[in-house]
Amino acid sequence: MSFERFFSAEEILIWRKQELSKGGRAVDLDWLLDIGGGLGWSTLQELKIFQSSFHKLDLSLEELSLIWMRHLSDQIPLQHLVGKCPWRDFELKVNSSALIPRQETEILIDIALKKVDAGLMKYGRWADLGTGSGALAVALARALPLWEGHAADCCNDALALAESNINTLTENANVSLHLGDWWEPLKPWWGNFDLVVANPPYIPKTHLSELDPVVRDHEPILALSGGDDGMDSCRKVIKGAMKGLRSGGWLLLEHNFDQSEQALNLMVDSGFLEVDFENDLEGVRRFGLALRP
């Protein structure tokens, strides 16, 4: 089916009002116009001023309406319906095999690059445990092109998604992918990692039913559930890091909003030094960092 993809600002604004009358959040519909339709945020703000202007969309308004209605009726994430998600300075392919990358996780990369810069390390070896879509791995490969990278996940489909994103979004990246549980597939390199990042599942299983249906029913439970207290995977990552990291290597971990004390205590008890935390975009303790002695 072929649709016309040139629309006036007035047509787009009328369409937007009609679609919002069906339900949903304005911020989500604007996201769809931006990422699905190719109408940038700044252009969207200008429509009210320049209503006689014309704009070419990547998808027609009819096609965007079909996506919006499916999002509302089936509560499927818009990212899954359009098959992509912007993250940092690139756009990831996404599907139901892996968690949709969250904006707050970008901070983990910022922390990592600060630690690398502080150590003036041009060469090194990093690992991304539970890589999922490969968001962290792609970001590290792009920022540290001379480093050797390793991305691991226990889900074959997620690993295939990560491989696709790494191949598409990095140029000649030296990244190896491994199938297995956390540190286990990286045994041959234990004691030789300079940097390890992880965003493991950390939702207590008793809280899963409280999640938004868009998340609960369409993102993999394997990437959400952290066991009884939400810390099962965090424990494995932290305890394994003493074997996996070299002396002077950094562990950077994302955890739930109320798990900072537990995570930092685990790091201290495991023998790490310079144990500290960083806040997320809302000012909440979300990241634990520690140096292997």
Curated annotation (Swiss-Prot):
| Physiological role | Methylates the class 1 translation termination release factors RF1/PrfA and RF2/PrfB on the glutamine residue of the universally conserved GGQ motif.
> What species is given as this protein's source?
Prochlorococcus marinus (strain SARG / CCMP1375 / SS120)
Matches recorded under InterPro entries: DNA_methylase_N6_adenine_CS, HemK-like, RF_glutamine_MTase_cyano, RF_methyltr_PrmC, SAM-dependent_MTases_sf, Small_mtfrase_dom
**EC assignment:** 2.1.1.297
- Top enzyme class of this protein? transferase
Q: Which reaction does it catalyse?
A: L-glutaminyl-[peptide chain release factor] + S-adenosyl-L-methionine = N(5)-methyl-L-glutaminyl-[peptide chain release factor] + S-adenosyl-L-homocysteine + H(+)
Which UniProt keywords are given for this protein, alphabetically ordered? Methyltransferase, S-adenosyl-L-methionine, Transferase
Tell me the residue numbers annotated for binding substrate: N199, P200, P201, Y202
The record's similarity note reads: Belongs to the protein N5-glutamine methyltransferase family. PrmC subfamily.
Protein name per its UniProtKB record = Release factor glutamine methyltransferase
- Binding, S-adenosyl-L-methionine: G130, T131, G132, S133, G134, D153, W182, N199
Listed under GO biological process in this entry are: methylation
- The organism sits in which domain of life? Bacteria
